[in-house]
Amino acid sequence: MREVIIASSVRTPVGRAFKGTLRATRPDEMAAIAIKGAVERVPQLDPKEIEDVIMGCAMPEAEQGMNVARIASLRAGLPVEVSALTINRFCSSGLQSIAMAAERIMTGGADVIVAGGTESMSMIPMGGHKISPNPWLVDHYPDAYLSMGLTAERVAQRLGIKREAADEFSLRSHQKALAAIQGGKFDDEVVPVSVSFSTPNGSKPKRQEVVFKVDEGPRADTSLEALLALKPAFHAKGTVTAGNSSQMSDGAAAAVVMSAERAQALGIKPLARYISFATAGYKPEEMGLGPVFAIPKALKMAGLKLSDIDVIELNEAFAAQSLGVIKEAGLDAEKVNPNGGAIALGHPLGCTGAKLTATVIRELKRRNGRYGMVTMCVGGGMGAAGIFENV
């Protein structure tokens, strides 16, 4: 098998869905910005050498339909000869796209692929515009369609995760994210997005241009008292609230994935080396625990132990789910999400895995660590985990 490297890995800042800066920015535009940004970070690479674009998207319809990867690649200015594919493994779609690119390169099917993900939760609702469940499953296994919030309630109930513990976890996520932003830790991975707005101005709306650079999810005004005051969002007697759940978000991310030999020939210094990727199925009604079963598989493929991993980016779908994974998988909490997670920074579904890849690579370099892991729970009852090596 050939060695595969990550030559660049970038993301847009993440906007709050519905009321945030990216609410009117199309997901294909966001993806194009991320693709262009990733390619521009590798000036030695002629775009004509890119053989494919793979983009993940959890709800690939409407503005993010029509094979959004192809639309975005053309919008990014890549040559028409560069083919493109959109893939979907729900929340791990962005990580899956990077793994698919790497595996294809490992087996000699390509030398250079751009991979990532995009999602506008402002434009495409959770579940898409028309949810049409399978009648047999509705009758025989209705939990296959259990809402994500209720799956988190199941995890919290079975594992005894208390409301205060979940809210404390959420508060720490905001505090770590704010510290990371103030310390400029995300600056290198973020590609700014220029956004036009129309603001009220009497009979003639005023056009305003802004350059969006900073994730807008983290809240400096939150507190444990404020979080504890929120009502349960999914079950009247539950513990899962809007405050201890991931934010609905808009964003995109992309990476240039290459064979090590081609990178060396072009004089490209790698950011990281791709090591392994694994998925696992689990009960849909406790889908948030999927990483517990994917992580050991990814470690085994890599020939590593959990103690070898220096940084872990665990997608914070819900605080209860995150605490459940940390407990059941035996993760070192000090290594998990050192710069905050999706509860503070947002979760643009199909983008997030690629976004977290950009983050884990930079954190490895700051810590002079060797191995980093990105791991995600997946709606429908799955987990995914990918391992990268600092170079």
What are these regions (language model features)?
Residues 27-43, 68-72, 97, 148-155, ...:
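Short, well-ordered amphipathic alpha-helical segments that serve as non-catalytic structural scaffolds
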